A protein has these predicted regions:
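Conserved polymerase palm-domain catalytic core
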Residues: 92, 136-137, 149-316, 323, ...
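Extended C-terminal regions of large enzymes
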Residues: 432, 436-550
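Reverse-transcriptase-like RNA-dependent polymerase core
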Residues: 50, 80-104, 117-126, 156-160, ...
Length: 551
């Protein structure tokens, strides 16, 4: 299908993305994609998406920051991006290293701001096409999906066959050696072609992007393998590369050919053919496959070792790819441990059952490392002498506490909440003793009296350490205020940003069917364009940032 670009507002761009998603789901392939990527509306939306990120203030090898481009006249910026993308020669990424949880260093490539804008323009057009072809149970780097959805679906698969002898209580926990660093470029381009991207100009740009290399300590290094970690387009490309693996397991062992009207009948046909059902869940390069017997789990591990080697040009780490019994150890996945255990006993013995259900718990080993990092942030409060900077650090500590609590929310996590609160409180006690040696006890106030986060702390009498500024108290919050929340329904696979129904489902999911207080207007309306043209005619030109801020 050759695309003719006819959109002049962000609303029309959204409708164009919806069309791409719909046609891609029908198996249509696309040419003429480059014209959509260099459209002025696409460029405005791309810059608008990148601008709020902290990374926009980080320069690449050319030392140019986002502010430089925002101060350009909009016509000049449009021409710069359009000319660069039509004759694309990406600059090498700047290599940085960030510390991982295990103490090792993760390489991170920082592209130039111009390359980031071009990659975002490409992502806006390519993502709807790819999303329509992606496997339903992959959750990493996809819109409207998160780690908690993967965990919820794993638990629901275990619970769905609670009375069956084929309950999936064995798992293969996969680990791919250097997945993103060993992606085969030639194979990736073939997979992009198969997924429906038939514009050879776009494929050539992606090929050049993959081979751009990086600068490390003033030395250039070429990249013949892998996707650059840190690039905007890299997560989408890695999902495209691993999508065949998802569908291989799904079509062979989960939903073979979909010959029946109902899924339960299809699973029954699978069992009649002598195949044990298997359930695949993937988040980025981490994946778990559930099955019902130890023998099938080991057979699957052996089969996938050969599959990755010969079909994906990747290697499974035999030391880190485990076969796990969920009834004993549980699987370690995305910071959680999922086990198959008996239901909690109720006061009525008549309701007791030996049936196993899935239970997610926090991975306390990983959580302990995060708590240690959090304690360091609490200690920083004592390094400041001015109350305003102390309050700012308290606010940052609170954001980390709430982030940890919300991440653990889908699991059975009350013990984890108390571990966070206990260690933070002990650290705060030592800090306040140093800051206020004689009156640190008076600096403990009830949560409900704090001026920061009043809605969160309303009605709580537990005391916390705080500082006073102009008669108002600013204190450290508690994790236990965020209640554990288990969602029994499986993830709604129809939630997507590329259909009206999918967006409506997502809004209902986030707001619990409560109406939104307001709706955000379009970023780029005809009135904005008219105003900019009028201003240009008066003898002065608004820069690109002014143009974007007209809402």
């Amino acid at each position: 299908m050759h695309l003719s670009v006819r959109f002049s507002t962000e609303k029309e761009l959204k409708q164009f993305q919806d069309l791409l998603y719909e046609k891609s789901g029908q198996g249509v392939s696309f040419t003429g994609l480059l014209e959509a990527m260099v459209s002025e509306v696409t460029i405005v939306t791309a810059v608008h998406n990148i601008k709020p990120n902290k990374g926009s203030k980080t320069a690449g090898v050319d030392r140019m920051k986002m502010d430089k481009y925002l101060q350009m006249p909009k016509e000049e910026l449009f021409q710069l991006i359009q000319s660069n993308i039509s004759n694309y020669k990406p600059k090498p990424a700047k290599r940085k290293y960030i510390e991982k949880a295990n103490g090792k260093k993760r390489p991170l490539g920082i592209p130039t701001v111009l390359d980031r804008i071009i990659q975002e323009c490409m992502r806006l057009i390519l993502e709807p096409i790819c999303e329509a072809r992606f496997y339903p149970h992959s959750y990493g780097f996809r819109p409207y999906r998160a780690q908690k959805h993967a965990i919820r679906d794993i638990v629901n698969v275990i619970n769905a066959s609670v009375k069956s002898k084929d309950q999936p209580v064995w798992a293969v926990e996969g680990d791919i050696k250097g997945c993103f660093d060993n992606i085969n470029h030639r194979l990736l381009l073939k997979k992009l072609w198969r997924i429906g991207i038939h514009d050879k100009r776009v494929l050539k740009i992606i090929s050049q992007m993959l081979k751009a290399g990086y600068i490390d300590q003033d030395l250039y290094h070429a990249t013949e393998m892998g996707t650059p970690q840190g690039g905007i387009l890299s997560p989408l490309l890695s999902n495209v590369y691993l999508n065949d693996f998802d569908w291989y397991v799904g079509r062979c062992y989960m939903e073979p050919h979909r010959q029946c009207k109902h899924k339960c009948n299809d699973t029954r046909r699978l069992k009649w053919s002598g195949i044990t059902p298997k359930y695949n869940f993937r988040y980025a390069d981490d994946w778990v496959i559930l099955t019902s017997t130890e023998q099938e789990a080991f057979r699957m591990k052996h089969e996938l070792t050969k599959y990755f080697k010969h079909r994906m040009k990747l290697e499974l780490s035999q030391e880190k790819t485990y076969v796990t019994d969920l009834r004993k150890n549980g699987i370690h996945f995305l910071g959680y441990i999922v086990k198959a255990e008996r239901k909690r006993k109720t006061p009525d013995p008549a309701t007791w059952s030996d049936n196993l259900v899935g239970k997610p718990f926090p991975d306390m080993e990983r959580l302990t490392k995060k708590i240690h990092t959090l304690q360091k942030e609490v200690r920083k409060i004592g390094l400041y002498t001015q109350s305003n900077t102390q309050a700012a650090q308290i606010q940052y500590v609170n954001s980390v506490i709430m982030g940890l609590a919300q991440y653990l929310q889908p699991s059975i996590c009350s013990h984890a909440y108390h571990a966070i609160d206990r260690r933070v409180n002990n650290t705060a006690l030592a800090v306040w003793k140093n800051l206020f040696p004689k009156q640190y006890n008076q600096m403990q106030v009830p949560l409900k009296e704090l001026s920061n986060l009043p809605h969160r702390h309303e009605g709580y009498d537990s005391k916390t350490f705080a500082i006073q500024i102009d008669g108002k108290w600013f204190g450290i919050t508690y994790a236990f205020i965020t209640h554990s929340r288990y969602e029994s329904k499986p993830f709604d696979q129809k939630m997507t940003p590329y259909t009206e129904d999918g967006r409506r489902r997502y809004v209902n999911y986030r707001t619990k069917h409560k109406p939104l207080p307001c709706d955000r207007p379009s970023i780029n309306t005809p009135e904005d364009i008219a105003l900019s043209i009028y201003a240009s005619g008066k003898g002065w030109k608004a820069n690109f940032e002014y143009f974007m801020n007209r809402e």
